């Protein structure tokens, strides 16, 4: 009986202790929740304060930026008005771009001063606010973007003006060359080579690309147009046309222009002949046609040639189908006492002298010296083949 009472007593005591422990834990949890709630209230208050400060700072920065943009636009308008007022004092030298560069430099210096001043003022005003958050909004970077855009525009204007300067100088130089040519009466010369061959084009050693073909009224046979493909910018053109029905095996090849690249050795012989004819025709444009014919006879004693200066393009025709050579060379033709060379570098050939005879092919940069014996051997080989 006593044991049962003791057991029931201990059970009751344990239940009371368990309930007291639960109440203590609940009180501790409530205290923690209350503490967290107080901290949340403090954080909310701090966040609202930060937002209010940010909004006020943003309004002040926007106001300052508006004032600075207005001042910079007024400065630029003032510069534009000064430029318009000074337009009537600009000399013809504006074509060379000197005054434009000075104006652009002055404008760039003024814009740099304005941007530097505005940045310093904005920094001072930001530090004077004293909020200490160092918040940089989107509007705060607008001024820097505007200054960068103005500098980029000035740089582009400089590039455009420099390109215009180079183009104006080139145009002036080209105009001077044209006036010089008009005064001296120089015209682009053409050299026609008439040869008998089975192929429609003479194997002159150069590489050509066909770019057109048409039929003329005077000759029903088609005329093909080629350009030199050994260089991308080579201005040399040639026309190939069969002569006529009575001479079906003869082709007329017309060369025009000057090569701007080195030629291979197999192309030097034809280039020497055509360049000599063109050079002598140009050098004889101011003299009589008889002197020009005498010079051509001196350089080409083996073939028939004709000169045509009536059209807009003075033309020399070398007829390789009709040999016009004597039994022996002329008495004044140089053999041992003089040198005979082909110089492909000088654009203005010197007139032939009694001791040194040079054939110039303007625009070329290679040299291919030929001796007198080798030159005569080539001519005799060609003449024997035609017979």
From Swiss-Prot:
It is found in: Nucleus. The keyword Transcription regulation applies. Keywords: DNA-binding, Nucleus, Transcription, Transcription regulation. The gene is WRKY36. The keyword Cell membrane does not apply. Pfam families: WRKY. This is Probable WRKY transcription factor 36. The lineage of its organism: Eukaryota, Viridiplantae, Streptophyta, Embryophyta, Tracheophyta. Transcription factor. Interacts specifically with the W box (5'-(T)TGAC[CT]-3'), a frequently occurring elicitor-responsive cis-acting element. Residues 329-346 have a biased composition (Low complexity).
């Amino acid at each position: 009986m006593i044991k049962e009472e003791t057991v029931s007593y201990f059970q009751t005591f344990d239940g009371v202790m368990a309930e007291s422990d639960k109440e203590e834990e609940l009180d501790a949890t409530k205290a923690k929740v209350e503490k967290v709630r107080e901290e949340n209230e403090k954080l909310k208050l701090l966040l609202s304060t930060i937002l209010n400060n940010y909004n006020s700072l943003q309004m002040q920065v926007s106001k300052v930026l508006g004032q600075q943009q207005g001042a910079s636009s007024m400065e630029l308008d003032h510069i534009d008005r000064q430029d318009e007022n000074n337009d009537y004092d600009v000399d013809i030298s504006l074509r060379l771009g000197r005054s434009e560069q000075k104006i652009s430099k002055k404008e760039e210096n003024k814009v740099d001063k304005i941007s530097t001043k505005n940045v310093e003022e904005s920094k001072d005003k930001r530090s004077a606010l004293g909020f200490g958050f160092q918040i940089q909004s989107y509007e705060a970077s607008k001024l820097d973007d505007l200054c960068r855009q103005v500098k980029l525009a000035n740089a582009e204007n400089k590039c455009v003006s420099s390109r215009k300067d180079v183009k104006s100088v080139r145009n002036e130089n080209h105009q001077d060359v044209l006036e010089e040519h008009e005064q001296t009466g120089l015209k682009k010369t053409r050299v026609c080579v008439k040869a008998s061959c089975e192929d429609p084009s003479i194997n002159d050693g150069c590489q050509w690309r066909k770019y057109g073909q048409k039929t003329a009224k005077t000759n029903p046979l088609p005329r093909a147009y080629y350009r030199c493909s050994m260089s991308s910018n080579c201005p040399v053109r040639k026309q190939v046309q069969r002569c006529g029905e009575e001479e079906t095996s003869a082709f007329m090849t017309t060369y025009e222009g000057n090569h701007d690249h080195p030629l291979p050795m197999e192309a030097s012989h034809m280039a020497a002949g055509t360049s000599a004819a063109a050079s002598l025709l140009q050098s004889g444009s101011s003299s009589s046609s008889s002197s020009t014919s005498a010079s051509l006879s001196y350089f080409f004693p083996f073939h028939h040639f004709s000169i045509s200066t009536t059209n807009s393009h003075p033309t020399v025709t070398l007829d390789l189908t009709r040999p016009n050579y004597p039994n022996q060379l002329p008495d004044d033709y140089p053999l041992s006492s003089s040198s005979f060379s082909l110089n492909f570098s000088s654009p203005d050939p010197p007139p032939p002298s009694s001791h040194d005879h040079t054939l110039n092919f303007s625009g070329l940069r290679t040299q291919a010296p030929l001796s007198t014996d080798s030159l005569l051997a080539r001519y005799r080989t060609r003449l024997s083949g035609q017979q």
